């Protein structure tokens, strides 16, 4: 054993001496048995033969430990046997990390992340919120809540929401909710809005607005709500739905008289019902345009008054603030940024899950729960008081908090975190390259369009947001999603850097690493392999490689001398000293 080790050390020393005393032949360290002309660097270079094919051992044995073996016939294996190791470990580096990134995360991105986005999040939106809105909230809207629709939501509805408002929600609006407004919604609160609450807005609240919140309201977000986001729901949210916040007492007492009148002039929201069906189609044109003019103005006068305490406070803090900070900012940071980074990609997983957890949860617990218990019960016993305490408080804490913390945090923590860590890492390898092949393809057909146009528009959307300056633009730029982008250094490193950093080091490196091995490493006495190796199994690539931030464990000192090192690539970091 001792003799063998001594021989090995002697060979090692000889190799080192040769390596440093014969720099001209440094590229022939592992080709003792071959003529120099066949393996000299220049010829290799001209023939475009990757350096890995000749100097792979260096990857693990910094050219010395494995070299001596080469001398004794272990050398031959070194070149051929360990050489494959190089190609193996080298090629894998390129194809493995490269291809996996593209195909692995790409394919999943496309079918898994893409399809979900479209069918899962999209479909629900249409059927869930559409149908419910139509049958559940629509029907009630017509007879019960119709009047408001006519005068109030009619005008706003004019372009997009108009038709629904007109025919569906308009006609009913006049007779039904018009007169009822005072008597109806007052007393109706119990009978009129109560009953509707149960069948119309109540049931809808739970099934329609509740479920929709997650599935339905989610999908609309992408196609319909996305477009609207900028013009319609964004601006409205702040000015329109916020203004409602003002009429605190209005919605409280108004429940009877106030909500009655408002009902007429603006249950913009009412249209929100009919739109359900519309909300699908309308989503883009209808809810979009209406959102701005219709839902916006209505929000102020109609739902505004009422909104104040009940829906207003909500509007302000809850649905209003949300609108501006939450639903507006969300749009910017949450719904907006999402639109771009978040909602685009998230749409499927992120916004999908968020939709459930973030927007869904809020929607469900916040807007849903409130809708059912708060908006439902209040409707019956009192839309007035509930409006104030019930829908107001819920709105404020429930939809407000969700909006800010929930929808914001989601954007930041929930939506951001996903974006950063979850979507970030993917963003790098997955979303970066995949973005092109994987998420791009999906993006194109499934969510890419949104990602591309949507996501690009998201950028434009940001501009669009700019239109809704503070509500939409600021939030966007603000910390909501910018922070994620920023704090979402993930966004920067995760989402932006991923593309950049990943594309650069994580993704680009692999690609470049290949040729880097061939040229750079050979040129730099092959010892530079450690650098690339470091890049390969170290932090950045590590994170990018496995979408995990845990770096590979360092190889044991004797790894290079084990059999597995010859036949299989090292499952550990090949740093300096190996």
Curated annotation (Swiss-Prot):
Residues 72-452 are annotated as: 45 X 8 AA approximate tandem repeats of [PS]-[AS]-Y-S-A-P-A-[AS]. It comes from the Eukaryota. Secreted into the perivitelline space and becomes stably incorporated into the vitelline membrane (at protein level). Expressed throughout the follicle cell layer of stage 10 egg chambers. Becomes part of a disulfide-linked network including other vitelline membrane proteins, including Vm26Aa and Vm26Ab, during vitelline membrane biogenesis and maturation. Sulfated by pip; probably involved in embryo dorsal-ventral axis determination. Sulfation by pip may occur on covalently bound glycosaminoglycans. One of its GO terms (molecular function) is structural constituent of vitelline membrane. Interacts with Vm26Aa and Vm26Ab; forms part of a disulfide-linked network within the vitelline membrane of stage 10 egg chambers. This is Vitelline membrane-like protein. The gene is Vml.
């Amino acid at each position: 054993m001792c003799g063998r080790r001594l021989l090995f050390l002697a060979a090692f020393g000889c190799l080192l001496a040769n390596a440093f005393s014969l720099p001209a032949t440094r590229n022939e360290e592992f080709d003792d048995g071959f003529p120099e002309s066949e393996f000299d660097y220049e010829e290799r270079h001209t023939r475009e033969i990757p350096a890995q094919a000749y100097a792979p051992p260096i990857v693990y044995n910094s050219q010395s430990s494995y070299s001596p073996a080469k001398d004794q016939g272990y050398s031959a294996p070194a070149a051929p046997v360990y050489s494959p190791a190089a190609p193996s470990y080298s090629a894998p580096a390129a194809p493995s990390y490269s291809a996996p990134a593209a195909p692995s995360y790409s394919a999943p991105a496309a079918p898994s992340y893409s399809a979900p986005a479209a069918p899962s999040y999209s479909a629900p939106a249409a059927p869930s919120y559409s149908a419910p809105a139509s049958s559940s909230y629509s029907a009630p809207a017509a007879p019960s809540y119709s009047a408001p629709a006519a005068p109030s939501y009619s005008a706003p509805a004019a372009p997009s929401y108009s038709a629904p408002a007109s025919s569906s929600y308009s006609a009913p609006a006049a007779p039904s909710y018009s007169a009822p407004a005072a008597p109806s919604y007052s007393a109706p609160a119990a009978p009129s809005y109560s009953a509707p609450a149960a069948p119309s807005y109540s049931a809808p609240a739970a099934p329609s607005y509740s479920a929709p919140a997650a599935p339905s309201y989610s999908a609309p977000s992408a196609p319909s709500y996305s477009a609207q986001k900028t013009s319609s729901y964004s601006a409205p949210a702040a000015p329109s739905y916020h203004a409602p916040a003002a009429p605190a007492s209005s919605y409280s007492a108004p429940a009877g008289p106030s909500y009655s009148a408002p009902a007429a002039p603006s249950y913009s929201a009412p249209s929100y019902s009919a739109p359900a069906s519309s909300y699908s189609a309308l989503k883009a044109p209808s809810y979009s345009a209406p959102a701005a003019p219709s839902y916006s103005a209505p929000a102020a006068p109609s739902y505004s008054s009422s909104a104040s305490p009940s829906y207003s406070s909500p509007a302000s803090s809850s649905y209003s603030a949300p609108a501006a900070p939450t639903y507006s900012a969300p749009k910017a940071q949450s719904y907006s940024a999402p639109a771009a980074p978040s909602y685009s990609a998230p749409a499927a997983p992120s916004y999908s899950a968020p939709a459930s957890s973030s927007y869904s949860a809020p929607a469900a617990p916040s807007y849903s729960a409130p809708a059912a218990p708060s908006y439902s019960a209040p409707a019956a016993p009192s839309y007035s008081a509930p409006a104030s305490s019930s829908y107001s408080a819920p709105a404020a804490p429930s939809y407000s908090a969700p909006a800010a913390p929930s929808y914001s945090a989601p954007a930041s923590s929930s939506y951001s975190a996903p974006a950063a860590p979850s979507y970030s890492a993917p963003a790098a390898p997955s979303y970066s390259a995949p973005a092109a092949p994987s998420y791009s393809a999906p993006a194109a057909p499934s969510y890419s369009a949104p990602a591309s146009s949507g996501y690009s528009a998201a950028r434009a959307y940001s501009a669009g947001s700019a239109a809704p300056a503070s509500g939409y633009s600021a939030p966007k730029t603000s910390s909501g999603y910018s922070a994620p982008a920023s704090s979402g250094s993930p966004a920067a490193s995760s989402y932006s850097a991923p593309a950049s950093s990943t594309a650069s080091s994580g993704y680009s490196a692999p690609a470049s690493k290949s040729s880097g091995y061939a040229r750079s490493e050979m040129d730099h006495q092959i010892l530079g392999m450690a650098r690339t190796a470091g890049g390969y199994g170290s932090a950045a690539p590590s994170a990018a490689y496995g979408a995990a931030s845990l770096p590979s464990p360092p190889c044991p000192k004797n790894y290079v001398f084990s059999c597995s090192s010859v036949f299989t690539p090292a499952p550990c970091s090949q740093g300096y000293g190996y």
